[in-house]
Amino acid sequence: MKKIYIAGIGPGSPEDITPAVHQALREADVVVGYAYYFQFIQEYLHEGAECIDTGMRQERERARLAIERAEAGQTVCVISSGDAGIYGMAPLLYEMCDERGSDVELEVLPGISAFQKAAALLGAPIGHDLCIISLSDLMTPWAIIERRAIAAAEADFVTALYNPKSIKRYWQLERVRELFLKHRSPDTPVGLVQQAGRPDQRVWTTTLRELDTQDVDMFTVLIIGNSQSFLSKGKIVTPRGYYRDKGSDEEKVGQRIMSESFRTILSLLKHPESYPLDHLWAMLHAVHTTADFEMEELLYSDPNAVSRIYQGYVDGKIRTIVTDVTMV
């Protein structure tokens, strides 16, 4: 069978390898990967499976070997750490198969990425919009990396940093810290996870002000919080943004009061988890307006009615909304 599984094996812990990847490894006649990663998957291979390992920066060679073996009729599994589509082998294999006009079937099997593992260990730091930036300038010019870092800092994204430091790249992380301090509070939480999911794992938190880049190496993932992120019992929490205790400088006092009111109402509802999000949104407004929690039992909305009305308004298809409210 002319097939290549492109498998993300997770950050390193056996329990983070998905069942689908287990199955692909068992089926493979040939497994291709960076030599360091084979220690994490050896036990899942069938007897007689051929392992082809290469060193760092030999991605094209790995891809070529995998394609050639698959074209010869073997089932091949190419492994990447984390998720194969995030700084992994998936894009390269698609590119090279396209260049060759190869008829090999490619199937990408997702894996737990290092930033996801790090986030879980740090609490809940990626509860809102986020971006991932690699600080390695091996394939991307530093000028572009810096421009992206500035954009992320200005836009208040939670930001995960990969490849923050190496022997030759020792100043880039400090530069990114400087850029973020121009747009974020010095007290912004920063989480660091070293060797995520591996025996030498280390997890700690700090702030942008106190971040010591000397503690970081190439196996460290950093997660920088946004303006709403906070530390709680040693964990980083980034609220989803719907109900916030603190408003930004631009937020009006009335909006902050409403946000706090909604948080309180939500905590007092009997069954908040059982309502569709658009119905819950309308219910919060109804209770907030009337101060009557019986609205939880009285309010009715057609399925998806609120979201459809909202979308129609955003799209400009609905220009008039008629309301009939009787206040007693």
Residue map of PLM features:
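General beta-strand structural signal in soluble alpha/beta enzymes
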Residues: 32-34, 53, 78-80, 106-111, ...
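Class I SAM-dependent methyltransferase SAM-binding "motif I" and its flanking Rossmann-like core
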Residues: 86-155
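Class I S-adenosyl-L-methionine
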Residues: 1-106, 212, 250-252, 302
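A contiguous loop/helix-start segment that scaffolds small-molecule binding in enzyme catalytic cores
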Residues: 4-6, 75-76, 154-251
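Electropositive, gly/pro-rich neighborhoods at or near active sites that engage anionic ligands
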Residues: 250-319, 326
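Short, polar loop motifs at secondary-structure junctions
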Residues: 35-39, 226-228, 325-328
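Short, basic, glycine/proline-bearing loop/turn elements
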Residues: 1-9, 49-53, 129-135, 285-297
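Glycine-rich phosphate/diphosphate-binding loops that line cofactor/substrate pockets in enzymes
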Residues: 66-73, 150-155, 305-318
